[in-house]
C-alpha cells in the first residue's frame, strides 16, 4: 500500500542525482506547508568559500539553529573528503524528536547523517510518530528508506515541477 492509498501516513522520499534540486524542492514545500501545518525537521545546505564547496551546515526548521554538519578535512568520522561534526547530530536528533509535529522535513537520509550515532533510531521514532514526512534520500540509501515505508520519487530536472505538484497535492497544498 502506498501513501497515495492511505490517509493516515505520508512518507515521501525524494531521490535523484546530485544537482537536480532535491533540497530546493523540499525548501519550497516547507515554505508552503508552514501556513497549514506545524513543521519540524532539518535541512542541509552547502557551505561555499570563494565558489568552492567546503562543507555542509544543518538547519533546524523550527528554531533556525544552524550548525556545521561537515567540513573538508582529515579525521573521523568522515564521508569522502568531509569530516562529520558529531555535535551537529544533537540538532538533527532534536529536530526529529520535536513534539506536536504534523509534517517533518528531513534533508537528507544519507551517509553523513548516518554517522550520527542515534540517527537511525531517531528516524524510526519520527516515522512511527509523525504523520507526514518529506525527505530527501541519497540514492545509495533508497533501500533503507523503502524499508522504513517511504515511497521514493526519482527527481530529475525534467520532472521537477510535476514532482513539486505531486508532493503539494499529497499535503493538500496548492501553488
UniProtKB/Swiss-Prot annotation:
Keywords: ATP-binding, Hydrolase, Nucleotide-binding. Pfam families: NTPase_1 (PF03266). Its EC number is 3.6.1.15. InterPro entries: AAA+_ATPase, Nuc-triphosphatase_THEP1, P-loop_NTPase. It comes from the Archaea. It catalyses: a ribonucleoside 5'-triphosphate + H2O = a ribonucleoside 5'-diphosphate + phosphate + H(+). It is an enzyme of class 3 (hydrolase). ATP binds at residues 16-23, 103-110. Disulfide bonds: none annotated. GO terms for molecular function: ATP binding; ATP hydrolysis activity. The keyword Nucleus does not apply. SMART domains: AAA. Has nucleotide phosphatase activity towards ATP, GTP, CTP, TTP and UTP. May hydrolyze nucleoside diphosphates with lower efficiency. HAMAP family: NTPase_1. Belongs to the THEP1 NTPase family. This is Nucleoside-triphosphatase THEP1. It comes from Pyrobaculum calidifontis (strain DSM 21063 / JCM 11548 / VA1).
